[in-house]
Amino acid sequence: ANIQSFSFKNFNSPSFILQGDATVSSGKLQLP
């Protein structure tokens, strides 16, 4: 995905930090 480093503090209020491909891992998107 082109969405990049997501860090979900709250599934209702996600924090988005754009910066590279990411994969979903336990409520967090992490760069591979």
Swiss-Prot record:
InterPro entries: ConA-like_dom_sf
Covalent S-S links between cysteines: none
GO terms, molecular function: D-mannose binding
Source superkingdom: Eukaryota
Calcium among keywords: yes
Coiled coil: none
Entry keyword Ligase: no
Keywords, ordered alphabetically: Calcium, Lectin, Mannose-binding
Family: Belongs to the leguminous lectin family.
Function comment: Metalloglycoprotein, containing Ca, Mg, Mn, and Zn and the carbohydrates galactose, glucosamine, mannose, and fucose. It agglutinates erythrocytes of blood group A1.
Record note on quaternary structure: Homotetramer.
Protein name (record): Lectin
